[in-house]
Design a protein with these regions (language model features):
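Short, low-complexity disordered leader/linker segments with a strong preference
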Residues: 1-46, 336-342
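Soluble non-cytosolic domains of exported or imported proteins
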Residues: 54, 82-85, 152, 156, ...
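Pocket-lining segment of extracytoplasmic ligand-binding domains
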Residues: 178-179, 185-272
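Ligand-binding clefts/hinges and TM-proximal coupling segments of bilobed small-molecule sensing domains
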Residues: 32, 155-176, 250-282, 321-325, ...
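Short, glycine-/small- and polar/acidic-enriched structural segments
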Residues: 33-172, 178-182, 197-203, 216-219, ...
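Extracytoplasmic/secreted envelope proteins and their assembly/folding machinery
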Residues: 57-61, 88, 92, 103-106, ...
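Conserved C-terminal helix/tail region of periplasmic/extracytoplasmic solute-binding proteins
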Residues: 310-342
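Secondary-structure end/capping motifs
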Residues: 240-316
Length: 342
């Protein structure tokens, strides 16, 4: 009888031991995946970003200064260039991972086996985003620019804007003295010295041009075109860093939303990153839109700019811009913002 009781006690203890082991094992198994996922998500995404000194640089500095990059565990290093085209050149030369530029500047670096890819819209000018200022009293209408000297940012969307201006108003480009510059400061210096008769000036420098005697003939409505800007990376980089690029898009979306909601407030956040008055930054932010998306309209504009530029020999290669669009990371995080159909 005693042996029987001992056996029962032993059996109960064995069952309890097995139950505890089973529960502990299940608990460890259940916790394994979340722990691994958390660890993966917390691995920092390191990226070298080339930004321009104007409109497109703003969301990156908002994301950095407001801690949005930190929120998504992104460790970003920055290189600042004069224009968007310079940032795209940096990506082409493997001096940066990401660049950003307006439509013409970006497509001018495609074709000929280029590995560059459009990932998302990032920023664009509204029709009020730039004005055509003249500094010669004899210029009363756009057609009067024939025979005058104008400031041109070679290789940037500004070159395309001038080409559109000349075509739409029947001005022979050969009749205009085009003063090529490599920085905004050079353009302002030409205006100040009196060497320039006209300049397309964006909102961040328009007040300075007006102080120097500039008189506006009108904004982008003169040519019915406002530039759109895009994020550009190499395809090989995108294929290796899909999850990190997804996080980057989320961070930039958050930064863009903050800018759109409060241009004045975000101007205060980034004023130390730029050598222009905070009110100029706020005006530039107000005259721009920020978003992470790729709409049919965005791609249609890229396509239109490309075809016109090839036809008018601003771009030497013939290619289809739609071959340079990479949607995977954007579709993963913001599928509803992709309305472009191949």
């Amino acid at each position: 009888m005693k042996n029987k009781k001992n056996k029962i006690v032993m059996l109960v203890l064995l069952i309890m031991s097995l139950a505890v082991s089973l529960f502990t094992g299940c608990e460890n198994k259940a916790n394994a995946n979340p722990a691994a996922e958390t660890e993966n998500k917390e691995a920092p995404f390191k990226i070298n970003i080339a930004v321009d000194s104007g409109t497109f640089g703003y969301p990156f500095w908002v994301a950095q200064n407001k801690g949005i990059f930190k929120k998504y565990n992104i460790e970003a290093t920055f290189q600042t260039y004069a224009y968007g085209i310079d940032t795209i050149n940096a990506v082409q030369l493997d001096q940066a991972d990401l660049g950003e530029g307006m439509d013409f500047a970006a497509v001018s670096r495609l074709g000929g086996g280029s590995e560059l890819q459009f990932v998302s819209f990032i920023a664009g000018n509204k029709m009020t985003g730039s004005n055509l200022y003249v500094l010669d009293d004899s210029i009363q209408k756009v057609q009067d620019l024939a025979g005058k000297s104008v400031v041109v940012q070679k290789g940037t969307v500004n070159e395309y804007i001038w080409a559109q201006t000349f075509e739409q108003y029947g001005i022979d480009p050969a009749s205009v003295n085009q003063l090529y510059i490599s920085s905004t400061a050079e353009g302002l210096a030409l205006v100040k010295s009196g060497d320039a008769d006209a300049i397309w000036a964006s909102s961040d420098i328009s007040s300075q041009v007006k102080e120097l005697g500039g008189r506006s003939l009108g904004d982008y409505n003169l040519i019915g075109f406002a530039p759109k800007g895009f994020l550009v990376l190499k395809k090989s980089y995108l294929e290796k860093n899909d999850e990190g690029v997804q996080r980057l898009l989320q961070a930039l979306k958050e930064a863009g939303d903050e800018i759109n909601a409060d241009p004045q407030g975000t101007a205060e956040i980034i004023k130390d990153n730029f050598k222009i008055p905070v009110e100029n930054i706020a005006k530039a932010l107000t005259d721009s839109e920020y978003d992470i998306r790729l709409s049919q309209e965005d791609v249609d504009q890229l396509d239109s700019v490309t075809k016109w530029s090839i036809k008018n020999k601003l771009i030497k290669y013939d290619f289809n811009v739609k071959d340079y669009i990479y949607l995977k990371p954007l579709q993963a995080v913001f599928p509803d913002t992709v309305t472009y159909k191949k």
